[in-house]
Amino acid sequence: MSQRLKTLYQDSIVPKLTEQFGYSNVHEVPKLVKISVNRGLGEASSNAKAMESSIKELSTITGQRPVITRAKKAIAGFKIREGMPVGVMVTLRSEKMYSFLDRLISLALPRIRDFRGISPKSFDGRGNYSLGIREQLIFPEIDYDSIDQIRGMDISIITTARTDEEGRALLREMGMPFRES
């Protein structure tokens, strides 16, 4: 099954970015490497049900089973010991990555209340973009009646872009709704 965003990238984005940045080789053009979806669960140590529901939700949203992240060090202030589960994470690559990004851009982000676009400043200096989502209900796969608590998640989009400007141009061409500042 060919992904809409992947064919868009190959057919129109690569020539546009090659012309815009003056690349001499098509392999210089920035491309998506992976998308990491992460959810930190502070209450996971005391509430096993929160972990189960988060695993179920993330696997429904991404189409891939998440891995449980564990504490690297014990922190007494947070009442966690080394090795305790503290969150869940999914790393998406290739077909699932393009499918998820397409659903995020065209279905999920427009469903955010008072949505005026996402911040164009959340790049890390190397062309990678991170955004936080406050509630999982923006994804159409999640049924309102089946959730026990509203939880957010962090989404990181990792690209091969060398600068923020290249990464921003790549994501804007893919249809990412950046806010006009």
UniProtKB/Swiss-Prot annotation:
One of its GO terms (biological process) is translation. The keyword Nucleotide-binding does not apply. It comes from the Bacteria. One of its GO terms (cellular component) is ribonucleoprotein complex. SUPFAM superfamilies: RL5-like (SSF55282). Keywords: Ribonucleoprotein, Ribosomal protein, RNA-binding, rRNA-binding, tRNA-binding. One of its GO terms (molecular function) is structural constituent of ribosome. Belongs to the universal ribosomal protein uL5 family. Part of the 50S ribosomal subunit; part of the 5S rRNA/L5/L18/L25 subcomplex. Contacts the 5S rRNA and the P site tRNA. Forms a bridge to the 30S subunit in the 70S ribosome. This is one of the proteins that bind and probably mediate the attachment of the 5S RNA into the large ribosomal subunit, where it forms part of the central protuberance. In the 70S ribosome it contacts protein S13 of the 30S subunit (bridge B1b), connecting the 2 subunits; this bridge is implicated in subunit movement. Contacts the P site tRNA; the 5S rRNA and some of its associated proteins might help stabilize positioning of ribosome-bound tRNAs. PANTHER family: 60S RIBOSOMAL PROTEIN L11-RELATED (PTHR11994). This is Large ribosomal subunit protein uL5. It comes from Picosynechococcus sp. (strain ATCC 27264 / PCC 7002 / PR-6).
